[in-house]
Every structure is written in C-alpha cells, then in structure tokens.
Amino acid sequence: LAGAIEAGTIDSGDIVFLKDTEEAAFIKADNKPMYVKSRTQESIQVNGVTGLGIGNGQTIPAGKSLDEIVKMLVQKAVPATYIKPSVSITNNGGQASGAVEAGTSITPKLRATFNKNDAGNLTKIEVMMGADSVGSGAESPYDYAGEAIVVGDETVSFSAKATYEEGSIKNDNLGQPSPNGHIAAGSVTSSAYNISGQRNLFYGTGVGATPELTSDMVRKLANKKLNPTQGLVFNIPIAIGQQYVVFAYPATLRDVNQVMYVETNDTGMASSFTKTLIDVADARGGQNGLKSYKVYSYAMATPAAAGMTFKVTI
C-alpha cells in the first residue's frame, strides 16, 4: 500500500481493499491510510508489565492489527526440548557382572542397545573391552559372543558405544524452528559392565592329624568367602569328632585380629593357632595364579567332645 501511494497509483480520497489482509482503508488528505479494521497508529512500548508474550521494555510496532497485537500478548515461544540418545549393555546369557574368584574362565555374551531419542540414525554400535572394540554392528540391539577369558586379579570392563547422525530440528510451540540444543552427530558410551577377579578366604575343619599345608589342601577346605577384608568376622563351626581347624586368607591383609571360642567366651584363642605362609593357586588350581596366603592351623589334643564355634576377626 505504501508503495502504491508513493507511486501516485493511489491518492487522497481513495478507498482501497487489501486482498492479503482483507482490510479496507481510506486514504486521508495527507496520503496516510486510515484502516477500517483497527490498526495501531503509533508504536506501543510495554511498560511495567511482565508475563506477556513480549517482555517488559519491548515495543509493539505501529501498524499492527488487533489480531496481531493479541497474538503478541498471549503467545510466547517455548523452545523445543531435545532428549539425548543413550546406549546400554546387558548380560545376554553369559557371565553376570560382579565378582568371581581370580582364575575363573568366563565367556562374555552381551547385548548392546541404542536408544535413539532425538538423535539421528544409528551408524555403528560396538562392544568395547577396555579401550578396544571387540565387536560391532549397524543395527540395535547388537549381540556379542566373545571367546573365553580367564579373569586374573583384575577387573575386566566391557561397555557399549553407539555412533549416530545429527538429529532433526524441531519447531517450537509457535511452529518456528527451534535449533538450540538439538542433537549433533556424535557418539555415546554406556556405563561399565565389570567382572572383577578376587581371592577367596578358605576355612574348615577335619578329623585326625592336621595334613600338610599346601595350596591344594587349602583350596579343598569346605568353606570359602570371596574378597575377605580387614575387620571381616566369620564363624567356624566345629562338629563333634573334629580335631583340627584351618583358615587362610591373602597375605596382603593384616595378621588375624582375634579368634574367640564362643561357648566359653575365650577371646584369646588366636595364640593357639600357628601361622604359615603358603602360596595358594587361583580358581584353576595347580600352580596357576599363585598368591601368598596366611594360613592359620590349630590342632586339638583330642577330638572335639561337643560342638564348638570359633568366631574369627581378621
């Protein structure tokens, strides 16, 4: 309209109908349009009011229609939100995560699953062992079946890694593109799936003379507990007729703190035990994974005439 007035196509006294906005306007003597449908004639500054679609201090430009003003006041752009992708790793019929005795042979069977959310398409999904990729695919879920591994005095750590394309840009609530925070192309790594090799505490009793203290003898004791620590308390039940007691744990721990004969409340039984250092094998037995153990043995003069309990504190 302004261009037509300037060109002289339209001048004062004319009445025009605007096709694009469906408004009628009268051209006044000063060649300025007067709209039949109300429009603001001056700019309006928002002053002292908050919570509107436009902020305090902003300006509503002149020439806005009533509909446009209402929209500006009651419609406020809310940016789109984006959810990051994720990837998980789970057991798929192989060795569960957690602790095993050092020397145990495990077969990892794992499943890696990509959760796309607002990222682009998956391009690669991998199973990592430490920093090394041991298997990969292009579709989720990806199943990995590895070779048998002997876990030593260590933690074997697996994880899943997914590489993906850029995600699409969403619109805000007003239908306008809202790119801030959209997901760029990249990769994501799962939390660790750990299998830790740990040593056992061994303990038990027997009939007759105390046998020679060897790795094999220690490993054959009837009871065991994984990963003993300083301060651990455990009970050794001694049945009628038993004549010797043996317990053993890694030599990296302190000397036994206390052995209590529970039935008599005698806390000084540790002095009756003899400590011997023995190299004890890991779960494979034989000479595999030998580690120094403190082996405590106690030989009774006569077989136990009644049930007894030794409460041991490392």
Regions found by a protein language model. Give the residues of each.
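Short, surface-exposed terminal/edge motifs of secreted or surface/virion proteins that either
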Residues: 12-38
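Proline/serine/threonine-rich low-complexity linkers at boundaries of modular beta-sandwich domains
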Residues: 67-90
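Acidic, Ser/Thr
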Residues: 74-78, 110-119
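Short, solvent-exposed loop/linker segments at the N-terminal edge
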Residues: 91-108
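Solvent-exposed loop/turn segments flanking beta-strands in beta-repeat/beta-sandwich domains
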Residues: 115-131
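Short beta-strand segments within Ig-like beta-sandwich modules, predominantly Fibronectin type-III
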Residues: 131-143
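Surface-exposed, short loops/turns at beta-strand junctions within beta-sandwich domains
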Residues: 144-159, 164-178, 287, 297-307
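Surface-exposed beta-strand/loop patches in extracellular or lumenal glycoproteins
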Residues: 232-264, 310
